[in-house]
């Protein structure tokens, strides 16, 4: 069966009792945002700078007080905080971790959280107080981030994505059951200049046991990444025993979110480029011909970040082709977004024919910086929410005004095997002055039907309980 980042109740798994995590700035890639629906190319418009481009809020959104138990305050949580969520939901600080990144539930029902800055994997076990007891499971790793549990040869294994390799650990009796096996080694985590842009990695496991992971670009928009050895800006796959290591999808600038859909397909959430030049010969803002110009009003809203299916041989086009929600498309639509030539790296389509590339299934507002992604089917999250995926949006740096951090929700269309544009499920992580007090990194459903959200800015794990 496909991998899930929430517990699977199998005959071999104990019954799970009901229970009441940018510190790593290099990992965010694109971290700016904007309105994906304004500034149609070629119309000479100069869109207003605002946050109106954020996905619409979920129906009946309400301001919900974030409950901070005694001893769990401090830092960003010294001030009372309010989250925007569907009416009837509740929110509580479940644990404090200074560098909380990706999450994965153990077969026994405990939550693993990665702390890349400290090289650790932490285990959070529910306690009687409604919070969690925190212990160290692994340490001394190289910036570990993504994690995935899967069945192998009749037992459980834990995959961990370090920046330079993918590890497999046997899991037994509620913990690491033996020595690690490196199944993909010497992965690129620095560019030739020694920079560490987009070095963080995620990992997921398909139904057939194939292990998928991302290798981000070393730059914002340097074509050399496509010819480096090993390649950058790709999604790779490997068998559990470390054989058949291969590139599956190219042109993926920073596909740091990976997840398996209900139909078994693999999907990635991608941080797209910053400072995009205007793509067409047309008036825009104060320019009579804006082609190739880097214009703040345009950059604010372009290009959209991507949620795309991982398909063998597919190319998302980076850095030659950019998703453009305005080109030959209903302005502002973020479904089936076409790819168009970048005026700096691919003028006139001389380096790559973007029209031959499949459109991006779903766009997110520009510079959202999506990170962890999880499909909720099969979880205990109630109602309509189980019929979609959640994506943790880390928020922007390259936009006036910044795109706010959030947890977005995308409905899964089972008939078409795709997703629909996002709505904001959880918001409210920004201060009145537009700065961020919190930045979600991951969101996973727990065995109790709650949603557990990691936040590496506030250093916390939130337990969000849906109504009903």
Give residue ranges: language-model regions:
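Bacterial signal peptide processing site
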Residues: 23-25
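Beta-propeller domain segments
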Residues: 54-84, 218-220, 238-241, 253, ...
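Blade-edge beta-strand/turn elements of extracellular beta-propeller
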Residues: 78-80, 84-96, 127-140, 171-193, ...
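Asp-box/WD-like beta-propeller blade repeats and closely related beta-sheet repeat scaffolds
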Residues: 143, 164-206, 217-220
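Residue position within the beta-strands of beta-propeller blades
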Residues: 112-114, 160, 211-215, 267-270, ...
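Beta-rich, blade/repeat-based domains predominating
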Residues: 97-108, 139-157, 161, 189-210, ...
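C-terminal motif of bacterial Sec signal peptides marking the signal peptidase cleavage site
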Residues: 18-21
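Blade-level signature of beta-propeller repeat domains, shared across WD40, Kelch, NHL, RCC1
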Residues: 444-468
């Amino acid at each position: 069966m496909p991998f899930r980042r929430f517990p699977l109740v199998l005959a071999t798994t104990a019954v799970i009792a009901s229970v009441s995590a940018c510190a790593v700035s290099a990992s965010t890639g694109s971290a700016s945002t904007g309105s994906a629906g304004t500034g149609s190319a070629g119309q000479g418009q100069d869109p207003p700078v605002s946050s109106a481009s954020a996905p619409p809020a979920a129906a009946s959104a309400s301001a919900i007080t974030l409950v901070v138990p005694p001893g769990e305050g401090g830092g960003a949580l010294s001030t009372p905080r309010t989250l925007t969520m569907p009416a009837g939901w509740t929110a509580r600080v479940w644990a404090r971790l200074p560098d909380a990144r990706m999450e994965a539930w153990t077969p026994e029902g405990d939550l693993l959280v990665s702390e890349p800055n400290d090289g650790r994997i932490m285990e959070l076990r529910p306690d009687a107080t409604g919070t969690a007891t925190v212990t160290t499971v692994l340490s001394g790793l190289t910036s570990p981030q993504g994690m995935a549990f899967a069945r192998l040869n009749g037992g459980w294994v834990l995959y961990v994505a370090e920046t330079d390799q993918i590890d497999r650990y046997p899991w037994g009796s509620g913990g690491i059951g033996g020595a690690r096996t490196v199944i993909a080694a010497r992965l690129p985590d620095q560019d030739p200049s020694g920079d560490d842009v987009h070095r963080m990695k995620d990992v997921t496991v398909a139904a057939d046991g194939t292990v998928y992971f991302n290798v981000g670009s070393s730059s914002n928009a340097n074509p050399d990444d496509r010819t480096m050895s090993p390649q950058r800006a790709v999604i790779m796959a490997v068998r559990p025993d470390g054989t058949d290591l291969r590139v599956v999808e190219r042109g993926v600038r920073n596909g740091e979110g990976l997840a398996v859909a209900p139909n078994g397909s693999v999907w990635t959430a991608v941080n797209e480029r910053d400072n995009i030049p205007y793509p067409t010969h047309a008036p825009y803002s104060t320019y009579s011909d804006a082609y190739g110009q880097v214009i703040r009003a345009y950059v604010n809203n372009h290009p959209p970040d991507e949620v795309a299916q991982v398909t063998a041989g597919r190319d998302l086009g980076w850095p030659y082709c950019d998703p453009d929600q305005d080109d030959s498309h209903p302005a502002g639509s973020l479904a089936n977004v076409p790819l168009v030539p970048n005026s700096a790296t691919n003028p006139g389509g001389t380096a790559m024919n973007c029209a031959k590339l499949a459109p991006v299934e779903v766009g997110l507002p520009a510079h959202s910086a999506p990170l962890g992604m999880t499909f909720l089917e099969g979880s205990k999250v109630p109602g309509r929410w189980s019929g979609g995926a959640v994506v943790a949006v880390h928020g922007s740096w390259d936009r006036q005004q910044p795109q706010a951090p959030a947890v977005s929700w995308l409905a899964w269309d089972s008939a078409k095997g795709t997703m629909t544009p996002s709505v904001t499920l959880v918001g409210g992580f920004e201060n009145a002055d537009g700065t961020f007090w919190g930045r979600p990194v991951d969101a996973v459903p727990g065995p109790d039907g709650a949603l557990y959200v990691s936040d590496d800015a506030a250093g916390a794990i939130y337990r969000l309980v849906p109504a009903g």
